[in-house]
């Protein structure tokens, strides 16, 4: 089942979250922490990739009540709303999606949107560690600048809701790296994984 904390390997496999959420048969919110929106227009209509899976969940999952996207840059978020290129053009989808850009989190403006979060649904939490600064995580994609303590602070209100359906974490490093860098990256990621796992176990009561 989806209950518990699942590690999904590198961000290439983030589309597995879409498969996990297909198992949910009740109204729920997806809380997505990611440096990327994962809502590009699909290159091939019936194939799901790490770049478009979240957009497909938003458009097609009948049980999804809200998708809360935390961490991409403002310019990437604007792109998903653009009339020409964007995925989220209908009013229905716009109402389902709440976004908090890296810039809004840094400036404190994110607080203005908190009232938009629906609190009466269970949540599934998905974390891509590419949201973190390289001090905390070494991934195979471009990364954000968030610290681990800030990520934990942002997770806390969702964990305290006490109604967690499941949690997944991706963002491991690329295996084709030269060995010294790979070992160093594995060490950084291992420490962050342990810290995140302990934190999530403690506060989510999974």
What are these regions (language model features)?
Residues 1-8, 12-29, 52, 62, ...:
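Catalytic cores of soluble, metal-dependent hydrolases
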Residues 45-48:
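Glycine- and acidic-residue-enriched helix-capping/strand-helix junction motifs
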């Amino acid at each position: 089942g989806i209950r518990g904390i699942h590690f999904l390997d590198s961000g290439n496999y983030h589309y597995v979250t879409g498969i996990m959420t297909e198992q949910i048969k009740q109204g729920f919110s997806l809380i997505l922490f990611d440096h990327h929106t994962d809502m590009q227009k699909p290159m091939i209509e019936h194939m799901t990739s790490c770049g478009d899976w979240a957009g497909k969940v938003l458009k097609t999952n009948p049980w999804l009540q809200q998708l809360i996207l935390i961490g991409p840059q403002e310019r990437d978020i604007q792109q998903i709303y653009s009339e020409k290129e964007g995925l989220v053009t209908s009013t229905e989808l716009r109402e389902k999606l709440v976004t908090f850009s890296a810039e809004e989190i840094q400036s404190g403006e994110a607080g203005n949107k908190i009232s938009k979060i629906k609190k009466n649904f269970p949540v599934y939490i998905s974390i891509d560690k590419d949201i973190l600064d390289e001090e905390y995580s070494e991934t195979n994609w471009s990364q954000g600048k968030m610290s681990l303590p800030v990520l934990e602070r942002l997770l806390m209100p969702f964990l305290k809701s006490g109604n967690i359906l499941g949690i997944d974490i991706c963002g491991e490093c690329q295996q084709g790296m030269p060995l010294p860098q790979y070992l160093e990256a594995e060490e950084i990621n291992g420490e962050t994984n342990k810290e995140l796992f302990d934190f999530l176990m403690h506060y989510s009561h999974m």
